[in-house]
């Protein structure tokens, strides 16, 4: 199985949090961005554009955190 596919045959359903675990996402800002992107505009509270803005902000925060750490940690 390649790195883009995960075996979920034993699971009844897969939520966003399971996806983050399956793909070994360790960064909280990146996990937050992924959740925003997967459900952009579909949660009722915020529109599509606002979710994209917030996902971008989370990614920018991850990059800022990487800049604070030397040498850069390639995740």
Regions found by a protein language model. Give the residues of each.
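Intrinsically disordered, low-complexity regulatory regions
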Residues: 1-75
